[in-house]
């Protein structure tokens, strides 16, 4: 394998055996591709904004004399970039400008004569833009639009599984679901009549809809039934025979023909009888007259001579009717063929219960059902029915819906109209009747072929269309109002409804979520999440077990592990690693094609529907060198079942072992040894890990760490290869390789790094360079690490030396005992950044003022404020400190004589304002790292605001001029090269000032042209610099766009350093979570024979019952990795020659049975080997991919190579007594995470505070500054102890005895510690509740 210079710094040893056929795809593509589709101009008009515009325009006036046509659209440039939007609290969006054409036709002239055309660009609101990382910045906060898994449009056949009716009869139904429009349901009732519902309203007999489609009873029967024809010959009744129809019936008379009896009366007709009849080609048989009684006629029979209706279609025949028919000359009678087995009389029965008999009465019936209480007119009824399913404005199946619809009805073509046709409705009814007759199967709703993904682009497009439809109505009104000659397109379009619809979707839709930004993994997972909830989806309460369950079609599409615990389990899922959506929005997953028993590297993406037709082998099937399966019988999946197939039956093979799981689960090493429930917790808890101060790569990983870190966008990644020309904490400059440059550019890439900014979860985002000056980099190399990344690999926690043993009860019930060394080394120290804002408003009594001149406050309290009343940067503040001094005008009050005197002496100011500072919340302390002041346009800026502005301007100028210098240097080096090659002497050239170089002329014409081009570029560069500087200056100095009534906003950022402490929650990656019980001195911790103490002691009882053995294997492998690191460290300390180092490291990389990774250190230079060794000192990082990881034997070999016991257990000594523990203990390195459930955020106490209005008890919870609940069980405890006075105090004065607590307060102030309990308020509430039931209950004094 070829490694780039950067990748050679630290190579992760990979234990994977299966070859990597397909690289992990870009993990955010589901978001980015979908939004790209929405924004991109699509000439076909199938997707995105283009589709929305084309579906609504052209808009015609009611009279048809004018229309507004759509021509094209363009998106402008956003005003602020992403960072500026976040700081200012605005939305990152671009203006949408649409070119519209107003066409006015001549009124009197013939159709289509144009009188006037006006074209104009119209502003249609702002469209939020997606950042490069798949997020949106809405009002300054980063949000993610989660994809939705909803029922695909199309037709579904289902049954109630016998649950509706008490008899347990299975009732079948069919439902046509459009993309937008009314739902159409057909269903059977227990009496086997077929009914129809529209939009889940009252049901009607299904034949009503056929009558409304203009079918007569005769035509209806003709569509759904086969005929049995009887003929009257010579006063005998003959029946046309189709032998197949007789199968399974019992003969009610002798079946004979040509004198031969085929079936005797009372015998069951079998297949043998039918074969005999067919062989003898019997077409007619004679039947007794009684046989026709009860049969149903299929059409109307009229007496030709009198015109009288003898018998109507769908009437039952009787012998009298037969005689009448015979008399009136009808010798051929057609009846319906029905039987109980597979030709039920459902439609015939339904026609009987149908109260309507013609089209109009059917339409009226439908109108009454849809609009109860309105008087129906013919026109209203017709237009309502027409608009339900047959109008493109109101109904759309969409391309997906039509495809699913036609596939379900087994039609050949998959394209067609978006509205329903007569045939569509009839075919659905026919298939439903077939299913009721026992032919065909019902659909599985939870099959991923029946559920599709709606991503950002599609949802945004739908919202945009909603806005356009609102505008359409208004435009129609305007077009019909006359005076069109003076109107322009922009006078008709009001952009408000459009931007309101878009804003509502991005701001407050259930699927637009505040991004989970704890760490890079939680960002990626959030963007890859798939929710079944949301508008048009399920609701938590209604979702049953089936929907939440893992379905066979989830394989390789949706992760079976990662889903939340709790009420949302199974409704919110995560996309599998390799899954993607196809053009219709169905999830598909890649497979390797198998041709003639040979596995090829050809890759096909299959959706859940296509997959059902193939036999698919698993990724861990053994192959020989040619790609044949080794075993004769291979474990495969087919039609959702897993079983053994012979190797020549296999069609496809999985691409990778981690194809099944999501990104989160693919980061858990030895996942295959963990119980599913614990793996779920492990995957979920990795998302809650807080980035530590110094990231530490996992010693035992899965090889996915690099992909996650790079794709998450928290690192700086090289866009093009080159060499590092400049690097400092906030900027990296790369001089691009010649072959990757665009013609005529300076060839310099500048990467500005993010420093100490706040994430959505108040964690700290900070980037640090991981390249040094002069290093070569390649495209895609990581240049700077972000939060939780280490040399371009995801690093959520720390590698800790753990021992599995009980220790004095401090690890009872999953508690964790931690060594003091962990705190000393700041291993789990995290930085949290909080934003506190102070808003100065314009009140009725005058404006609030931010000032340091505050009445009645001591000097000490204001010591950290500057003269503008705002805290200094760098000040260390604690709970209750003033950050911003703000005073609010106070209404005039009646003054006492003393106050009047004071006013007269000291002037006005002192008493007409009250203070309303911004203080540090209780329990928070930290350092002020940044202050920002936003001032409304037209309000004078205070001194601090001007200082900040000046600083920002200076910084911007410095940044830009540095950029310019770098680019200039690059340009001049190229100019110099041209001049030197054109014959100018280098020494003379270097003596000339650089600005004069461009004045030189060269004789070589080609070189002179190059020189002129470079000169042009130089001028352009300077011009560009001026422009950028001016734009920056304008942005910094302009006033801010604040909410109405707001004059100023001051934002103060506090950085809080949190060390690990008892009460913090920690976890491993296998769902093994616990709370820190004690931080133990180093000298008390258990230590090994070398005197190395362990860092963490875990309880071994946490393993067997939870069945997450992965943690034990991880511990062993971590120990081996560390052992090898220790040996390398020792060799480096002894300064052994590079050859020995190279040989030892090579041995470590080669270890393992047929691993796929081939590292050849002979191609590395000595420096590269030394640098690799330096990075392996703390342990050799190892990858053990999911389901393809290290085997037990390999772990033992690695332990042996590191000179460690192969059992993985060592003898420990008690740190307090020095005695040896009685048996060896499992010790090793486990990757531990600190979760964002910190005791500092949960710790809370209250003395006095707010009360609930009704019960007068203190509120609950930290957010409300509530009290501690003294609940039912606590009361029992005091009762059991007989602590009567304590109990009384708890339930009265400390809770809700209003008078008692006031008296108590007064007593304490007076120094008298007596208490007088009274009536608790909650007792009065109880009395009132009983009275509200009409029971008068009174308390009487004795």
From Swiss-Prot:
<dbReference type="GO" id="GO:0032549">
    <property type="term" value="F:ribonucleoside binding"/>
</dbReference>
<dbReference type="InterPro" id="IPR015712">
    <property type="entry name" value="DNA-dir_RNA_pol_su2"/>
</dbReference>
<dbReference type="InterPro" id="IPR007645">
    <property type="entry name" value="RNA_pol_Rpb2_3"/>
</dbReference>
<keyword id="KW-0804">Transcription</keyword>
<dbReference type="InterPro" id="IPR037033">
    <property type="entry name" value="DNA-dir_RNAP_su2_hyb_sf"/>
</dbReference>
<dbReference type="InterPro" id="IPR042107">
    <property type="entry name" value="DNA-dir_RNA_pol_bsu_ext_1_sf"/>
</dbReference>
<dbReference type="InterPro" id="IPR019462">
    <property type="entry name" value="DNA-dir_RNA_pol_bsu_external_1"/>
</dbReference>
<dbReference type="InterPro" id="IPR010243">
    <property type="entry name" value="RNA_pol_bsu_bac"/>
</dbReference>
<dbReference type="InterPro" id="IPR014724">
    <property type="entry name" value="RNA_pol_RPB2_OB-fold"/>
</dbReference>
<dbReference type="Pfam" id="PF04565">
    <property type="entry name" value="RNA_pol_Rpb2_3"/>
</dbReference>
<comment type="function">
    <text>DNA-dependent RNA polymerase catalyzes the transcription of DNA into RNA using the four ribonucleoside triphosphates as substrates.</text>
</comment>
<dbReference type="InterPro" id="IPR037034">
    <property type="entry name" value="RNA_pol_Rpb2_2_sf"/>
</dbReference>
<dbReference type="GO" id="GO:0006351">
    <property type="term" value="P:DNA-templated transcription"/>
</dbReference>
<keyword id="KW-0240">DNA-directed RNA polymerase</keyword>
<dbReference type="InterPro" id="IPR007644">
    <property type="entry name" value="RNA_pol_bsu_protrusion"/>
</dbReference>
<dbReference type="GO" id="GO:0003677">
    <property type="term" value="F:DNA binding"/>
</dbReference>
<protein>
    <recommendedName>
        <fullName>DNA-directed RNA polymerase subunit beta</fullName>
        <ecNumber>2.7.7.6</ecNumber>
    </recommendedName>
</protein>
<dbReference type="InterPro" id="IPR007641">
    <property type="entry name" value="RNA_pol_Rpb2_7"/>
</dbReference>
<comment type="similarity">
    <text>Belongs to the RNA polymerase beta chain family.</text>
</comment>
<dbReference type="Pfam" id="PF10385">
    <property type="entry name" value="RNA_pol_Rpb2_45"/>
</dbReference>
<dbReference type="GO" id="GO:0000428">
    <property type="term" value="C:DNA-directed RNA polymerase complex"/>
</dbReference>
<dbReference type="GO" id="GO:0003899">
    <property type="term" value="F:DNA-directed RNA polymerase activity"/>
</dbReference>
<dbReference type="InterPro" id="IPR007642">
    <property type="entry name" value="RNA_pol_Rpb2_2"/>
</dbReference>
<dbReference type="InterPro" id="IPR007121">
    <property type="entry name" value="RNA_pol_bsu_CS"/>
</dbReference>
<dbReference type="Pfam" id="PF04560">
    <property type="entry name" value="RNA_pol_Rpb2_7"/>
</dbReference>
<dbReference type="Pfam" id="PF04561">
    <property type="entry name" value="RNA_pol_Rpb2_2"/>
</dbReference>
<comment type="subunit">
    <text>The RNAP catalytic core consists of 2 alpha, 1 beta, 1 beta' and 1 omega subunit. When a sigma factor is associated with the core the holoenzyme is formed, which can initiate transcription.</text>
</comment>
<keyword id="KW-0808">Transferase</keyword>
<keyword id="KW-0548">Nucleotidyltransferase</keyword>
<dbReference type="Pfam" id="PF00562">
    <property type="entry name" value="RNA_pol_Rpb2_6"/>
</dbReference>
<dbReference type="Pfam" id="PF04563">
    <property type="entry name" value="RNA_pol_Rpb2_1"/>
</dbReference>
<dbReference type="InterPro" id="IPR007120">
    <property type="entry name" value="DNA-dir_RNAP_su2_dom"/>
</dbReference>
């Amino acid at each position: 394998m070829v490694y780039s210079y950067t990748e050679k710094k630290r190579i992760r040893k990979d234990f994977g055996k299966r070859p990597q056929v397909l690289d992990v795809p870009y993990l955010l593509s589901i978001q980015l591709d979908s939004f790209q589709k929405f924004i991109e101009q699509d000439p076909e008009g199938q997707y995105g904004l283009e589709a929305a515009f084309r579906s609504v325009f052209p808009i015609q006036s009611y009279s048809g004399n004018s229309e507004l046509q759509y021509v094209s659209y363009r998106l402008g440039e956003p005003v602020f970039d992403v960072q500026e939007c976040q700081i200012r609290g605005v939305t990152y969006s671009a203006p949408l400008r649409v070119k519209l054409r107003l066409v006015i036709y001549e009124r009197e002239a013939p159709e289509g004569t144009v009188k006037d055309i006006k074209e104009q660009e119209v502003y249609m609101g702002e469209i939020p833009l997606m950042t490069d990382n798949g997020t949106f910045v809405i009002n300054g906060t980063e949000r993610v639009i989660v994809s939705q898994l909803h029922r695909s449009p199309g037709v579904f056949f289902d049954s109630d599984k016998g649950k509706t009716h008490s008899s347990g009869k299975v009732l079948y139904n069919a439902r046509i679901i459009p993309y937008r429009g009314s739902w159409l349901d057909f269903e059977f009732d227990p009496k086997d009549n077929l009914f129809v519902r529209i939009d889940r309203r009252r049901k009607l007999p299904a034949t009503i809809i056929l009558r409304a489609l203009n079918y007569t009873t005769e035509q209806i029967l003709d569509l759904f039934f086969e005929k049995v024809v009887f003929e009257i010959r010579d006063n005998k009744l003959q029946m046309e025979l189709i032998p197949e129809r007789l199968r399974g019936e019992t003969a009610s008379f002798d079946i004979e023909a040509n004198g031969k009896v085929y079936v005797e009366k009372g015998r069951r007709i079998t297949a043998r009888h039918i074969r005999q009849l067919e062989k003898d080609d019997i077409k007619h048989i004679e039947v007794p007259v009684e046989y026709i009684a009860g049969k149903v006629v299929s059409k109307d029979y009229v007496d030709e001579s009198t015109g009288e209706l003898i018998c109507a279609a769908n009437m039952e025949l009787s012998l009298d009717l037969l005689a009448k028919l015979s008399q009136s000359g009808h010798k051929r009678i057609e009846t319906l063929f029905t039987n109980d087995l597979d030709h039920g009389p459902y439609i015939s029965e339904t026609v009987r219960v149908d109260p309507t008999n013609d089209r109009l009465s059917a339409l009226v019936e439908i109108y009454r059902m849809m609009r109860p209480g309105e008087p129906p007119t013919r026109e209203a009824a017709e237009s309502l029915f027409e608009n339900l399913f047959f109008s493109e404005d109101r109904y759309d199946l969409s391309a997906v819906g039509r495809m699913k619809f036609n596939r379900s009805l087994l039609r050949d073509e998959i394209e067609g109209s978006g509205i329903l046709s007569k045939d569509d409705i009839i075919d659905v009814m026919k298939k439903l009747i077939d299913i009721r007759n026992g032919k065909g199967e019902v659909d599985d709703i939870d099959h991923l072929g029946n559920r599709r993904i709606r991503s950002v682009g599609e949802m945004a497009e739908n919202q945009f269309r909603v806005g356009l439809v609102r505008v359409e109505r208004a435009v129609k009104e305007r077009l019909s109002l006359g005076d069109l000659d003076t109107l322009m397109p922009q006078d008709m379009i009001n952009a408000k409804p459009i931007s309101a619809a878009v804003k509502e979707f991005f701001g407050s839709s259930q699927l637009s979520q505040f991004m989970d930004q704890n760490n890079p993994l939680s960002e990626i997972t959030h963007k890859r999440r798939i929710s079944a909830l949301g508008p048009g989806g399920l609701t938590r309460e209604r979702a049953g077990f089936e929907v939440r369950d893992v379905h066979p079609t989830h394989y390789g599409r949706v992760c079976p592990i990662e889903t939340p615990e709790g009420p949302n389990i199974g409704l919110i899922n995560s996309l599998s690693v390799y899954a993607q959506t196809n053009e219709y929005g169905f999830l598909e997953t890649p497979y390797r094609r198998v041709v003639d028993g040979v596995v090829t590297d050809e890759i096909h993406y299959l959706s859940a529907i296509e997959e059902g037709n193939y036999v698919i082998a698993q990724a861990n099937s053994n192959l020989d060198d040619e790609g044949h399966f080794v075993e004769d019988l291979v474990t495969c999946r087919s039609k959702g079942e897993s079983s053994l197939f012979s190797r020549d039956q296999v069609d496809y093979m999985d691409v990778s072992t981690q194809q099944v799981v999501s990104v989160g689960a693919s980061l858990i090493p030895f996942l295959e040894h963990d119980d599913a429930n614990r793996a779920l917790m492990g995957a979920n808890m990795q998302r809650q890990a807080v980035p530590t101060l110094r990231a530490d790569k996992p010693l035992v990983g899965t090889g996915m760490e690099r992909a996650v870190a790079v794709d998450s966008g928290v690192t700086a990644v090289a866009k093009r290869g080159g060499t590092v020309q400049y690097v400092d904490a906030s900027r990296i400059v790369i001089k691009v390789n010649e072959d990757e440059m665009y013609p005529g550019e300076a060839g310099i890439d500048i990467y500005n790094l993010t420093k100490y900014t706040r994430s959505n979860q108040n964690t700290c985002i900070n980037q640090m360079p991981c390249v040094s000056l002069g290093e070569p980099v390649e495209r895609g190399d990581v240049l700077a690490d972000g939060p939780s990344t280490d040399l371009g690999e995801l690093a959520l926690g720390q590698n800790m030396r753990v021992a599995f043993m009980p220790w004095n009860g401090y690890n009872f019930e999953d508690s964790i005992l931690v060594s003091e060394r962990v705190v000393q080394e700041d291993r789990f120290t995290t930085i949290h950044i909080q934003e506190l804002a102070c808003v100065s408003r314009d009140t009725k009594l005058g404006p609030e003022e931010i000032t340091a001149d505050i009445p009645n406050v001591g000097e000490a309290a204001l010591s950290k404020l500057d003269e503008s009343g705002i805290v200094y940067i760098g000040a260390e503040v604690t709970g209750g400190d003033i950050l911003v001094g703000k005073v609010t005008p106070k209404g005039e009050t009646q003054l006492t004589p003393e106050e009047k005197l004071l006013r007269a002496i000291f002037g006005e100011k002192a008493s007409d304002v009250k203070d309303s500072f911004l203080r540090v919340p209780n329990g928070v302390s930290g350092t002020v790292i940044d202050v920002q002041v936003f001032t409304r346009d037209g309000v004078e800026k205070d001194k601090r605001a001007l200082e900040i502005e000046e600083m920002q301007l200076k910084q911007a100028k410095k940044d830009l001029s540095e950029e310019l210098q770098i680019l200039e240097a690059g340009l001049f080096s190229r100019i110099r090269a041209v001049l030197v090659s054109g014959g100018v002497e280098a020494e003379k050239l270097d003596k000339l000032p650089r600005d004069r170089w461009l004045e030189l002329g060269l004789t070589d014409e080609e070189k002179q042209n190059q020189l002129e081009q470079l000169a042009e570029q130089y001028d352009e560069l300077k011009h560009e610099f001026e422009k950028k500087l001016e734009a920056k200056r304008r942005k910094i100095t302009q006033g801010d766009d604040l909410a109405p009534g707001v004059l100023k906003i001051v934002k103060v950022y506090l950085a809080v350093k949190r060390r690990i402490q008892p009460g913090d929650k920690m976890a491993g990656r296998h769902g093994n979570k616990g709370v820190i019980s004690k931080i133990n001195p180093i000298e008390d911790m258990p230590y090994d024979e070398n005197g190395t103490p362990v860092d963490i002691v875990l309880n071994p009882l946490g393993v067997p019952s939870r069945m997450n053995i992965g943690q034990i294997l991880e511990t062993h492998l971590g120990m081996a990795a560390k052992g090898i690191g220790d040996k390398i460290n020792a060799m480096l300390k002894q300064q052994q020659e590079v050859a020995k180092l190279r040989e030892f490291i090579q041995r470590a990389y080669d270890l393992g049975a047929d691993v796929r990774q081939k590292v050849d250190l002979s191609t590395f230079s000595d420096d590269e080997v030394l640098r690799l060794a330096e990075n392996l000192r703390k342990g050799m990082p190892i990858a053990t991919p999911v389901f393809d990881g290290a085997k037990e034997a390999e772990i033992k070999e690695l332990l042996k190579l590191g000179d460690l016991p192969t059992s993985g257990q060592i003898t420990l000594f008690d740190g307090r007594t020095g005695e040896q523990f009685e048996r060896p203990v499992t010790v090793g390195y486990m990757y531990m995470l600190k979760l964002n459930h910190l005791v500092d955020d949960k710790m809370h106490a209250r003395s006095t505070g707010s009360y609930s209005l009704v019960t007068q008890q203190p509120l609950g919870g930290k957010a409300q500054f509530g009290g501690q609940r003294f609940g039912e069980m606590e009361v029992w405890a005091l009762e059991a102890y007989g602590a009567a006075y304590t109990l009384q105090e708890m339930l009265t004065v400390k809770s809700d005895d209003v008078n008692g607590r006031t008296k108590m307060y007064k007593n304490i102030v007076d120094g008298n510690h007596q208490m007088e309990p009274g009536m608790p308020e909650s007792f009065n509430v109880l009395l009132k509740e009983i009275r509200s039931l009409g029971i008068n209950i009174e308390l009487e004094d004795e």
